[in-house]
């Protein structure tokens, strides 16, 4: 049995969805819960609501899929990052964003009681759009 949480985070309209054996059970956007239009942070309330609605314990989640891969297309991103973040006024922001994505497993284990053995999958952002059309 597989239980998968899909997370759209750090991007406009953050949300979460939960699947059991490839069947969508529940999905919700964070803005429906925190009342902040087009929320672009981490959808913690959405994840909790997915688990609550389906009555699934967070320790039973086998996989988490993130809507972005912080290391994809790095060769194209580096010139942009250098110009905007390294030499601009947002120097620390880019490193914080990448760090948040990479450390997602620690956050889920420490704050939402996920099992340490949960598998984290980083999916390229555009591939995530393509995959969503399947459902």
Residue spans for each PLM region:
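Short acidic/glycine-rich loops and adjacent helix/strand connectors
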Residues: 1-135
């Amino acid at each position: 049995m597989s239980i998968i949480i899909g997370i759209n985070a750090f991007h406009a309209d953050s949300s979460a969805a939960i699947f059991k054996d490839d069947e969508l059970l529940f999905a919700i956007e964070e803005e429906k819960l925190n009342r902040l239009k087009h929320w672009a942070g981490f959808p913690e309330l959405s994840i909790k609501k997915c688990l609550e609605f389906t009555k699934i314990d967070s320790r039973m989640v086998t996989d988490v899929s993130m809507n972005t891969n912080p290391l994809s297309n790095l060769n194209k991103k580096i010139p942009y990052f250098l110009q905007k973040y390294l030499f601009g006024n947002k120097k620390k922001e880019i490193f914080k964003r990448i760090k948040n994505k990479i450390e997602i497993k620690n956050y889920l284990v420490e704050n939402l009681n996920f099992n340490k053995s949960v598998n984290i999958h980083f999916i390229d952002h555009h591939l995530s759009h393509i995959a969503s059309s399947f459902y």
